[in-house]
């Protein structure tokens, strides 16, 4: 998956970028807008150009924080440089994240935008695509998910730990996740009456049991 920008390329030595849609591999950087590269695909010309894009994931930019499969798409959540971004692959083609022209089966990329920081800490495929961030829990809907139908809505404001990864788990149809506070475990459950998710504190009557959990499992 690719992100187009005019960002500095000083940390991109060894990375592949695209110039006018053609691949080159950066071998040296001499300035914020100047680099030497090995041509991997024949270029249309040799003139300077601002038409370039860089891989969203690399040693320079960071790697996906979390992943899951949902509706025949691979879902990647967050990275070091793009902590609130979601990427969904092409339907049925888990390695193709190209958004193309926005056709129903093509790749999808979007950011969680709100009034607070939302670094993605987990994604989970349940009744809907669920996204767990450092500050809230979200529901991604669309039947099926397409670039035109996708909708994103914040459900609750509990938050997940930022200093360690604790993947959420399915427990009898509900999603259980560790709270950012380190003193609670919540059940993220959908209610038909409210047509929304609720986060119920499962440690409410035994707070002393939960102290900075590091992993969860359910059998």
Region locations from a protein language model:
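Short, surface-exposed beta-strand/loop "edge" segments at domain boundaries and coil↔beta transitions
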Residues: 10-11, 43-47
């Amino acid at each position: 998956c690719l992100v187009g920008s005019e960002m500095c390329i000083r940390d991109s030595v060894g990375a592949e970028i695209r110039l006018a849609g053609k691949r080159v591999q950066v071998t040296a950087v001499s300035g914020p807008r100047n680099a030497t590269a090995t041509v991997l695909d024949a270029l249309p010309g040799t003139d300077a150009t601002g038409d370039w894009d860089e891989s969203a994931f690399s040693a320079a930019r960071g790697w996906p924080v979390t992943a899951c499969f949902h509706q025949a798409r691979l879902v990647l959540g967050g990275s070091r440089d793009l902590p609130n971004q979601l990427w969904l692959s092409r339907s049925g083609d888990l390695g193709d994240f190209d958004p193309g022209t926005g056709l129903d089966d093509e790749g999808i990329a979007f950011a969680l935008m709100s009034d607070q920081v939302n670094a993605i800490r987990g994604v989970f495929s349940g009744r809907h695509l669920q996204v767990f961030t450092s500050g809230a829990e979200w529901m991604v809907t669309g039947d099926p998910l397409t670039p035109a139908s996708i909708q994103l809505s914040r459900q609750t404001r509990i938050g997940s730990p930022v200093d360690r990864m604790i993947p959420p788990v399915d427990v009898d149809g509900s999603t259980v996740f560790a709270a950012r506070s380190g003193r609670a475990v919540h059940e993220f459950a959908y209610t038909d009456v409210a047509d929304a998710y609720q986060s119920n504190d499962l440690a409410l009557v035994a707070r002393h049991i939960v102290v900075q959990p590091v992993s969860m499992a359910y059998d």
